[in-house]
Regions:
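Long, contiguous binding/interaction regions
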Residues: 1-220
Length: 220
């Protein structure tokens, strides 16, 4: 199984794109996959932001797929890719015993490999995995893409509701007070669960990705 997704970010103040299999953030590392295998390929056509042009990506996507299939036969799993500063960097994890099989030969491009003992999957958790803000961006993007598929005019403001759940009434009230200061309305709801403290906030906003993500991050 896999749960691949991507998000844009910056690394060392330079534009970057990260493609990561979020499946492992739920189930944890496979047994014995204690070693981080890194393959870096120098892109020939960097593009405007150093993340590669579509034609460059087409070549390296094909090679990436080929490499993943080859390494999977030796218990090495592909977990993510970073594109930034003209480098196409792929990360794999597997047992240390698989090191002899980790060889990279991209078409007409310079490459380097590194192998690190990383039983805690620190690189996966701290670098590849999205922050809370980026996770919210990914969820917001999915919603916007669904609206686009329905031909929604995203830039037209409309009432948008946001739900939040709390363990105490005090936590809910503090949240509502802060949100109302930013122009949100507390849509009162009756809950059948006396221990359930729910806030339903609304505000008129466009629902293009930039606008809706900005609204969500006010409420997070």
């Amino acid at each position: 199984m896999s749960e691949w997704d991507f998000y844009p970010c910056t690394i060392d103040d330079r534009p970057a794109s990260i493609f990561v299999d979020l499946y492992f953030s739920r189930i944890g590392p496979p047994v014995g996959a204690d070693t981080h295998f890194v393959a870096r390929i120098a892109m020939l056509d960097l593009g405007t932001h150093g993340m590669g042009t579509p034609s460059e990506a087409e070549v390296l996507y094909a090679y990436e797929t080929e490499l993943e299939e080859k390494l999977s036969a030796h218990e090495i799993v592909y977990v993510g890719r970073i594109r930034t500063r003209g480098v196409w960097q792929m990360s794999f994890y597997g047992p240390a015993s698989s090191k002899p099989y980790f060889q990279v030969s991209p078409p007409d491009r310079a490459s380097t490999i590194e192998v690190h003992y990383d039983p805690a999957w620190s690189f996966y958790e701290q670098t590849l995995s999205p922050s809370i803000e980026r996770r919210n961006w990914m969820r917001d993007r999915a919603v916007v893409e669904e609206l686009e598929a329905r031909r929604d005019p995203l830039v037209i403001p409309r009432k948008v509701e946001h739900w939040a759940y709390f363990k105490t009434a005090d936590a809910r009230e503090a949240y509502v007070e802060r949100a109302t200061q930013d122009g949100f309305t507390d849509e009162k709801i009756d809950s059948d669960e006396p221990s359930s403290f729910v806030a339903r906030m609304s505000r008129e906003d466009p629902v293009d990705l930039e606008s809706i993500h900005a609204a969500v991050m006010i409420l997070v």
